[in-house]
Amino acid sequence: MENKPPVINLPEKETVNTPQKGGKFTINDFEIGRPLGKGKFGSVYLARTKTGHFHVAIKVLFKSQLISGGVEHQLEREIEIQSHLNHPNIIKLYTYFWDAKKIYLVLEYAPGGEMYKQLTVSKRFSEPTAAKYMYEIADALSYCHRKNVIHRDIKPENLLIGSQGELKIGDFGWSVHAPSNKRQTMCGTMDYLPPEMVNGADHSDAVDLWAIGVLCYEFLVGKPPFEHEDQSKTYAAIKAARFTYPDSVKKGARDLIGRLLVVDPKARCTLEQVKEHYWIQGMMEAKIRAEKQQKIEKEASLRNH
């Protein structure tokens, strides 16, 4: 982002850097609606611009909490990365601004809400739904990796659902620009950590491949594959890629998950191979056929009335 302001020691005056439009905003330019979510450092609200009535989500973060939590540089990195990403399966960061006490991120609004809430209600997703989401997240991460961005914290809590039912990656707090492609920082969520992170070894963009393998399992089963009450048992299972499938997980899905949850990062299948996998392609074709049939039946029903 050009002319990117520092996150700390921001001026008292309300101002904004809007590379997309070059305009200036303050919180007074928005009508604030219902809360969409709450985090450790602030909350997210549905809002709309007073001019044009354009719906957005505004993440309101308290500077004092960011500083005391030592995450101001993480936020700066999140803004830098997300402002440069433009993909249908990634939440857009439109702009940001601040006042004396708060920082405001103006984000794309995802009316379908949070993925983990849908998963909690559904218990688990159908194969066609899980396959569709897997295709979308693989496409989004492929785009990120081409830009040397590693997400490092893929999990249902960081995913949202758009107006057409599409998956959207919504949180880039742990992501990094990694042109060198080697990192050693421990980050992310325990159940989704790959063996190389648990072992404290160098890691690359292959961490995201492991994470979507865990995600696919959780989509289909309702819980992650390495979940144990004892943290040491979770880590041991991750290091050995040791897990079992319930009978409900079919052969095709097992094949894909097994190609992603591989201890050796170099041996994991690529994101393009995920998109082209026979289980994903077959499930998506079946979903399209079912939707077409529903449309035909609905039109026939309307004609008969």
Swiss-Prot record:
UniProt-listed InterPro entries: Aur-like, Kinase-like_dom_sf, Prot_kinase_dom, Protein_kinase_ATP_BS, Ser/Thr_kinase_AS
One MF term in the entry's GO annotations: ATP binding
Pfam families: Pkinase
Catalysed transformations (reactions): L-seryl-[protein] + ATP = O-phospho-L-seryl-[protein] + ADP + H(+); L-threonyl-[protein] + ATP = O-phospho-L-threonyl-[protein] + ADP + H(+)
Active site: 153 (proton acceptor)
Post-translational modification remark: Phosphorylated. Increased phosphorylation upon chromatin obstructions at anaphase.
Compartments reported by the entry: Cytoplasm, Cytoskeleton; Chromosome; Midbody; Cytoplasm, Cytoskeleton, Spindle
Sites where the protein binds ATP: 36-44, 59
Result of knocking out the encoding gene: RNAi-mediated knockdown disrupts the localization of the condensin subunit smc-4 to mitotic chromosomes. RNAi-mediated knockdown causes failure in mitotic chromosome segregation and cytokinesis, leading to aneuploidy.
Any single biological process term in GO: positive regulation of mitotic sister chromatid separation
Subunit structure: Component of the CPC complex which consists of icp-1; csc-1; bir-1 and air-2. Within the complex, interacts with icp-1; csc-1 and bir-1. Interacts with zen-4. Interacts with tlk-1 and bmk-1.
Role, per record: Serine/threonine-protein kinase component of the chromosomal passenger complex (CPC), a complex that acts as a key regulator of chromosome segregation and cytokinesis. The CPC complex has essential functions at the centromere in ensuring correct chromosome alignment and segregation. Required for histone H3 phosphorylation during segregation of homologous chromosomes in meiosis and mitosis. Required for histone H3 'Ser-10' phosphorylation. Phosphorylates tlk-1 at 'Ser-634', which enhances its activity. Phosphorylates zen-4 at 'Ser-680'.
Protein name listed in UniProt: Aurora/IPL1-related protein kinase 2
Annotated source species: Caenorhabditis elegans
Taxonomy of the source species: Eukaryota, Metazoa, Ecdysozoa, Nematoda, Chromadorea
The encoding gene: air-2
